[in-house]
Amino acid sequence: MNETTIASSAAASPGEHTHSHDRRMPGLDLLRAIAVVWTLLFHSFLVGGLGADWQWAQRYGWMGVDLFFVLSGFLIGSQVLAPLARGERFSFGAFYLRRAFRILPAFWAVLALYLLWPDFAEAPGMEPWWKFAFFFVNVSIDYGRNAAFSHAWSLCVEEHFYLLFPLLALGFARLRSGGAVVAFCIALVLGGIALRTAIWLHFDALAPDRNWFVEDIYYPTWNRLDGLLAGVALAVLKTYRPALWSRFGAHANRALIVGLIGMALAFWLFRERAGLLGNSVGWPVLSFALALLVFAGAQAGSWIGRRAMPGAGWLAAVSYSLYLIHKLIYGLVEMHLGDALEGRGYIAFMTYGATSLFAAALLYYIVEKPALRLRDRVLRHNAVRPLVPMSAQARSDG
């Protein structure tokens, strides 16, 4: 029951550095940086935890991935919806090309490391390579035996979102019915509550000898749509109701406060992480609270959006690489320094974190960033018009 990730929100994901000097959204950079650090804290369970001093931050660190999902829904949703709102033709080719260059190079590089040096992995067993290559591992995994690189589950959710959302958006744009969109969203939320409740009650009664919470509730895409939906709802508001978005933006700090209160409620609902209460109604509550934080972060006048936090932009830029590689580095550091770091919470976190940051920087500058430059050259060569004018922050998920 110890899995989470961040993923990448790969579009929620870690940001992608660009060479543009357009205005960034420092509030979203800050949220992304918080999400990745929170995830690193949570995954310290792999190396024995970081002690009582960090337990308060470690316990709910799995929520970092949900923050990435909301960010992804908002930023990618905005990219897809903007041309549709203007009545323009949406380029599926350009969209999927951007996604492929954004996600695959760093992902393939880390997958290769796991396959070539399995002794360094954070867990002894690993699912077959093809489940990762086809982004299938989140719906077919033996977590008890094959937990290595299992944090790729959130990338699978993201990829499924990339494949399906543009089609849904195009369909609803042609339907031109706001009521249908609202009904679909309500059905998705209520259906998710019902499905997770049914799965939980079924397996709680059977009590199978496996980690059914992770395998059947936490990982599968159909149970993890709340965060993406909350982010897309923000994108719909911004794209189709810009005046309302601006009006609400004047109250961004109130939204931030309500969002933090909502987070406190989510902590209470998930006080038993694998319990029925959290896994039935907890996900929509958590996603709504995180959406309020993202909304506040997207406003230039909010407390978290008005100025950049030193280091947050860079950490946001490398967060995808950091997410991908940190568990592998945890395993490597534990192999060589585990005994010396045991029980030394602050020093242990700094050691594991700094080593992971160094590895992430290498992955980012050697693989991820050159791939993004190549993507831009390919798009220019093919004379593919950008999907939508975006800030540098939005392109960080482009």
Regions found by a protein language model. Give the residues of each.
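Function-critical hydrophobic alpha-helical transmembrane segments in multi-pass membrane proteins
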Residues: 145-167, 228
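Central hydrophobic cores of alpha-helical transmembrane segments
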Residues: 131, 183-190, 260-261
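Alpha-helical transmembrane segments in multi-pass integral membrane proteins
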Residues: 3-27, 34-37, 41-62, 77-94, ...
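Extracytosolic (periplasmic/ER-lumenal) interhelical loops and adjacent juxtamembrane/interface segments
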Residues: 129-144
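Hydrophobic alpha-helical transmembrane segments that constitute the membrane-spanning cores
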Residues: 109-117
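Alpha-helical transmembrane segments of multi-pass membrane proteins
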Residues: 93, 97-110
